[in-house]
Amino acid sequence: MIETWTASDGYPILVASWIPSQKPTARVLLIHGVQSHQGWYQGLGRRLAEAGFEVHLADRRGSGGNTQDRGHATSPRRLVDDIGELLGELDRKSPGIPTCVAGISWGGKLAVLAAARFPERVASLALVCPGMQPRVGVSRREKLRIAIAYFTNRRKKFAIPLSDPALFTANPVGQAFIQSDPLSLREATAGLLVASTLIDRAVASAPRKIKQPVLLMLAGEDRIVDNAKTRDYFDRLASLNRTILEYPGAHHTLEFESDPTLYARDLADWILQLGA
């Protein structure tokens, strides 16, 4: 089911939802990466719903099926506001259900900031190959061009440095999907790219604020994320309930692995045991 939810500033956001047949044991809000969108994670949403969870995944403003201001963001706060407002709306519709915010790739950064800023709405946090410590990025020259554009034309677009589908997966079918996906975000404005840099700074100072149970899922052959630095960051979280799962041989987007049910099942089992 896909519906349009309107943020407080009037921006219409597409939200995919998967509702279990029985009363949900918990709610999961999935947050996708910088290039991806809800279409990449239909399988994960369905599998989590089959495990008994109410699941939602909103296309980030300017990405996926949200065509208004394509590739743009006005500020980091606005992106985190969207998550907080959606969490509030979901709580109003179905009160009393604990929510796990699960951030995937670049979405892991937003998930961390949401958990830090809205602890009363986020019962647990899952980080799936999160992009806090990336191995890829723009060159110094490109950074300078982006900085100039930020002060002269914030809607000027630049290529996102993730053009090779092999960065995401070694699966030929997954690579073909990414290559031909018309909704993948391949360019971002100076506004979004500077917002991402500011988000990085906020994420760096967030560990002391993360006190919820946290799950970190890592792909052993990740070419986008620096796993060692990500583990170091994870160890600094204030949470006393931290779990790490690593998938040897897996690449960045676990959804494109030969058996995507594995990480979905592990995520579901972890959320379920929190309520035991």
For each of these PLM feature ranges, what is it?
Residues Q35-H37, G64-S94:
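Catalytic nucleophile-loop/oxyanion-hole region of alpha/beta-hydrolase
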Residues I104-T189:
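Alpha/beta-hydrolase-fold enzymes
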Residues M1-P20:
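N-terminal cap/lid segment of alpha/beta-hydrolase-fold proteins
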Residues Q212, D226-D235:
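Short alpha-helix in the alpha/beta-hydrolase fold that links the catalytic acid
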Residues I210, L216-L218, D222:
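Short beta-strand/loop motif that positions the catalytic acidic residue
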Residues E221-V225, T253:
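Acidic catalytic loop of the alpha/beta-hydrolase fold
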Residues G45-Q68:
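Conserved alpha/beta-hydrolase
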Residues T243-A276:
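Catalytic active-site module of serine/aspartate enzymes centered on a nucleophile-bearing elbow/loop
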